[in-house]
Structures are given as C-alpha cells and as structure tokens.
Amino acid sequence: ENFVGGCTPGYQRTADGRCKPTF
C-alpha cells in the first residue's frame, strides 16, 4: 500500500489535503 498521501488507488493528494482522481 504505497499510495501518495494514503488516498484511494487512482487518486492523488493535492496541496490542500484533498484526494483528487488522476484519470
């Protein structure tokens, strides 16, 4: 489980601490 920011797979944590989809 090496997710950036600990978000759901396919999502990335933004600067404001939210998880947004990368697709």
UniProtKB/Swiss-Prot annotation:
Entry keyword set: Cytokine, Disulfide bond
Disulfide bond listed as a keyword: yes
GO cellular component: extracellular space
GO MF: cytokine activity
Disulfide partners: 7-19
Tissues in which the UniProt entry reports expression: Hemolymph.
Role description: Causes rapid, rigid paralysis when injected into Lepidopteran larvae. The physiological role may be to reduce hemolymph loss following injury and promote wound healing.
UniProt record similarity statement: Belongs to the GBP/PSP1/paralytic peptide family.
Entry protein name: Paralytic peptide 3
